[in-house]
Amino acid sequence: MDLPVGPGAAGPSNVPAFLTKLWTLVSDPDTDALICWSPSGNSFHVFDQGQFAKEVLPKYFKHNNMASFVRQLNMYGFRKVVHIEQGGLVKPERDDTEFQHPCFLRGQEQLLENIKRKVTSVSTLKSEDIKIRQDSVTKLLTDVQLMKGKQECMDSKLLAMKHENEALWREVASLRQKHAQQQKVVNKLIQFLISLVQSNRILGVKRKIPLMLNDSGSAHSMPKYSRQFSLEHVHGSGPYSAPSPAYSSSSLYAPDAVASSGPIISDITELAPASPMASPGGSIDERPLSSSPLVRVKEEPPSPPQSPRVEEASPGRPSSVDTLLSPTALIDSILRESEPAPASVTALTDARGHTDTEGRPPSPPPTSTPEKCLSVACLDKNELSDHLDAMDSNLDNLQTMLSSHGFSVDTSALLDLFSPSVTVPDMSLPDLDSSLASIQELLSPQEPPRPPEAENSSPDSGKQLVHYTAQPLFLLDPGSVDTGSNDLPVLFELGEGSYFSEGDGFAEDPTISLLTGSEPPKAKDPTVS
């Protein structure tokens, strides 16, 4: 309940009621014990806020809340004055609160008009600040549209690059798959070609077989790929012929069939009547082998290292004629001497006893005149042994060089090469002839190239088994075999081969023709028309 303001405290009518009541309350001397002016008159003090709220506030206001009174003072701009002694932690002995306002002064009531209540004023923006210029908006929209277009262009480019990247990855995967498959096929082809080269060169077979030229007590080892042959008589008559059953190849290597001083090749041909003459080199051993056909083995002492000689003996003349004989001359002499009569042909029969002959007329029976003997002198055993050792060393070096590359043949890989897993379009391979030639050139740098005629002439080229044993060559009586046989003697085959060329190496070393593994082209029989 508001108390009536005294006549001295009457103020202008535009002063708020709160300020008028506050002026009267502060100026009332009855309430100086609780509220009064400061000594300077610029502020007022409130003592004992609790008692002031209970006793004084209800008389002038409708409430007795000190907090509401302080809040109204703040609304009109009054500020609380804080002294130094009141700002510490120690509570002051007297509860004293001082408020001041620049226009609330003692004795100057007219200044109350200047005290205004604070109004929560929101700063009103000016219209020119709120209004945005149209050109700025247009420019902003243009920039936004431009940025949007650039973004769409970048998105399209990124999408195109993404598609291209996916296509490239798919192509890379396809190429990798094709490359792996092609590499697999190439590896299989290389392994297959290497296996062919290895089979042609007889790689991986290392033999250390004694020559057994001097050892007649031990039998030679049988060849790995041997077939049972038999030499059968056609004519049983003759000074050296004896009926005997067909013998196999095992009898050829019997210990008693090898002379103590080395094997001697002898040939018996039909000639005109001539008297035999003793040869100065030795005597003829006419011992027939057990179960063997007509064979003559001549024992002679080792000859000096020179070309073989032919000893032509006649019993009517005491002198002997020694002439240098090359294998070509020997074959030519045999061919010339066999012109009057059909040439001697070896009839080969297998283990079952079948003889391969043609329907040709047999040769006339041999006459009772003495026969002319042509014998090839024994080669020097040391020279032949050195030659075989050199060839063995060369083969070992070649095998070591080829094995150092670490080639391995996988049979399963070779079987998979022709399996249905590899389709026909995938087998588009390069030229196999050039690849095989290049691989052979790389694998065998030390081997001289052979002429193509020698390779094509042999049906079993590349499948021969080299056998380092000294085997005697047996030449049969021309009268004891059929002239219509398909197989010619060994010396007839050597006459037309490429082994005896015009070079010095071939003329001086006739053992090459005896040790080679491939067969030369067979000579045509001059007696067969």
UniProtKB/Swiss-Prot annotation:
<keyword id="KW-0007">Acetylation</keyword>
<dbReference type="GO" id="GO:0001162">
    <property type="term" value="F:RNA polymerase II intronic transcription regulatory region sequence-specific DNA binding"/>
</dbReference>
<dbReference type="GO" id="GO:0101031">
    <property type="term" value="C:protein folding chaperone complex"/>
</dbReference>
<dbReference type="GO" id="GO:0045931">
    <property type="term" value="P:positive regulation of mitotic cell cycle"/>
</dbReference>
<dbReference type="GO" id="GO:0031490">
    <property type="term" value="F:chromatin DNA binding"/>
</dbReference>
<dbReference type="GO" id="GO:0007584">
    <property type="term" value="P:response to nutrient"/>
</dbReference>
<keyword id="KW-0805">Transcription regulation</keyword>
<dbReference type="GO" id="GO:0010667">
    <property type="term" value="P:negative regulation of cardiac muscle cell apoptotic process"/>
</dbReference>
<dbReference type="GO" id="GO:1901652">
    <property type="term" value="P:response to peptide"/>
</dbReference>
<keyword id="KW-0346">Stress response</keyword>
<feature type="cross-link" description="Glycyl lysine isopeptide (Lys-Gly) (interchain with G-Cter in SUMO2); alternate">
    <location>
        <position position="298"/>
    </location>
</feature>
<dbReference type="GO" id="GO:0000976">
    <property type="term" value="F:transcription cis-regulatory region binding"/>
</dbReference>
<dbReference type="GO" id="GO:0071466">
    <property type="term" value="P:cellular response to xenobiotic stimulus"/>
</dbReference>
<dbReference type="GO" id="GO:2001033">
    <property type="term" value="P:negative regulation of double-strand break repair via nonhomologous end joining"/>
</dbReference>
<dbReference type="GO" id="GO:0001892">
    <property type="term" value="P:embryonic placenta development"/>
</dbReference>
<dbReference type="InterPro" id="IPR036390">
    <property type="entry name" value="WH_DNA-bd_sf"/>
</dbReference>
<feature type="modified residue" description="Phosphoserine; by MAPK8">
    <location>
        <position position="363"/>
    </location>
</feature>
<feature type="modified residue" description="N6-acetyllysine; alternate">
    <location>
        <position position="91"/>
    </location>
</feature>
<feature type="modified residue" description="N6-acetyllysine">
    <location>
        <position position="524"/>
    </location>
</feature>
<dbReference type="GO" id="GO:0000165">
    <property type="term" value="P:MAPK cascade"/>
</dbReference>
<keyword id="KW-0158">Chromosome</keyword>
<dbReference type="GO" id="GO:0005634">
    <property type="term" value="C:nucleus"/>
</dbReference>
<dbReference type="GO" id="GO:0045651">
    <property type="term" value="P:positive regulation of macrophage differentiation"/>
</dbReference>
<feature type="modified residue" description="Phosphoserine; by MAPK3">
    <location>
        <position position="307"/>
    </location>
</feature>
<feature type="modified residue" description="Phosphoserine">
    <location>
        <position position="292"/>
    </location>
</feature>
<feature type="region of interest" description="DNA-binding domain">
    <location>
        <begin position="15"/>
        <end position="120"/>
    </location>
</feature>
<dbReference type="GO" id="GO:0097677">
    <property type="term" value="F:STAT family protein binding"/>
</dbReference>
<dbReference type="GO" id="GO:1904843">
    <property type="term" value="P:cellular response to nitroglycerin"/>
</dbReference>
<feature type="short sequence motif" description="9aaTAD">
    <location>
        <begin position="412"/>
        <end position="420"/>
    </location>
</feature>
<keyword id="KW-0509">mRNA transport</keyword>
<keyword id="KW-0234">DNA repair</keyword>
<feature type="modified residue" description="N-acetylmethionine">
    <location>
        <position position="1"/>
    </location>
</feature>
<dbReference type="GO" id="GO:0000792">
    <property type="term" value="C:heterochromatin"/>
</dbReference>
<dbReference type="GO" id="GO:0061770">
    <property type="term" value="F:translation elongation factor binding"/>
</dbReference>
<dbReference type="GO" id="GO:0046982">
    <property type="term" value="F:protein heterodimerization activity"/>
</dbReference>
<dbReference type="InterPro" id="IPR000232">
    <property type="entry name" value="HSF_DNA-bd"/>
</dbReference>
<dbReference type="GO" id="GO:0062029">
    <property type="term" value="P:positive regulation of stress granule assembly"/>
</dbReference>
<dbReference type="GO" id="GO:0001228">
    <property type="term" value="F:DNA-binding transcription activator activity, RNA polymerase II-specific"/>
</dbReference>
<dbReference type="GO" id="GO:0098847">
    <property type="term" value="F:sequence-specific single stranded DNA binding"/>
</dbReference>
<dbReference type="GO" id="GO:0097165">
    <property type="term" value="C:nuclear stress granule"/>
</dbReference>
<dbReference type="GO" id="GO:0071280">
    <property type="term" value="P:cellular response to copper ion"/>
</dbReference>
<dbReference type="GO" id="GO:1990837">
    <property type="term" value="F:sequence-specific double-stranded DNA binding"/>
</dbReference>
